[in-house]
Amino acid sequence: MTRMRQSFRSGLAVVAIVAGAGCVVRPANPRPAAPSIAIPRAIPNEIRWFRTSAEYRALTRQTYQLAADRLLELTRGVAAQSWAVILDADETVLDNSEYQRRRALDDSAYTEASWSAWVNERTATGIPGAAEFTQRVHALGGRIVIVTNRAMALCDATRANLQAIRVEADLVLCQPPGESDKNPRFERVRAGTAAPGFAAANVVEWIGDNILDFPGMSQDVRADPAAFSEFGKRYFVLPNPMYGSWQQIREP
């Protein structure tokens, strides 16, 4: 009996082992790796704000309206064609945020080649309020002078783009080789030596998006409240959080 029980138990053990062997889970074929998905690059907030916000449009229109209102006082009794307003081009009259957006999407930096290609597209849109302001200047008997640090080779494309956004400039002064400082060009406008046939002008206002767009100004004045006394009177600045001479300032 004992031997029978042992044999029976041994038989059960064998059956259990055999049965268990049939339940072994074999490893499944490894799944192929999921294809990588290119995640769209986020547009930096400063570019998004410039391109999409209501606040930006309110600020540019507000600035140009203030400048137009001041003209009535500054030019009262002044002979027509004897005075002028000097404006910067980029981010003052011409909106190049599409160029900045493309650079962000491509994760690429500014280059002269990419910038030249963009300018030659001649598709920059107008800064809100700019065209209406320049038309107001002409209606009051003034002249519009654009002083820009675009290269001389880009001047024709710049003039064409200005006309496309309904800005009729009486004079466009691009950057002569080696002269990034705008002050000499400002002086030539005043002296009547800026271009043949362009008479000396009493410059009554300057408008720009960079502190360097204003006579004798630089980032060094930022801690001197007295240096800003002409802003809102004859100098009018537009917001540009995308780029500018401010980028060269080191945090304290």
Model-derived regions, located:
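Bacterial N-terminal signal peptides
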Residues: 11-21
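C-terminal cap/substrate-recognition subdomain and adjoining C-terminal extension
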Residues: 54, 142, 151, 155-252
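Bacterial N-terminal signal peptides that target proteins for export
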Residues: 2-12
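Non-catalytic pre-domain segments flanking phosphatase-related domains
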Residues: 23-87, 249-252
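Solvent-exposed, polar/charged alpha-helical surfaces in well-ordered, non-transmembrane soluble domains
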Residues: 65, 69, 128, 132-135, ...
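Short, acidic loop-to-helix structural element flanking the phosphoryl-transfer center
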Residues: 116-145, 152-153
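Active-site neighborhood of HAD-like aspartate-dependent phosphohydrolases
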Residues: 75-82, 93-125, 139
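Acidic helix-start/capping segments at beta-turn-to-alpha-helix junctions
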Residues: 83-93, 152-154
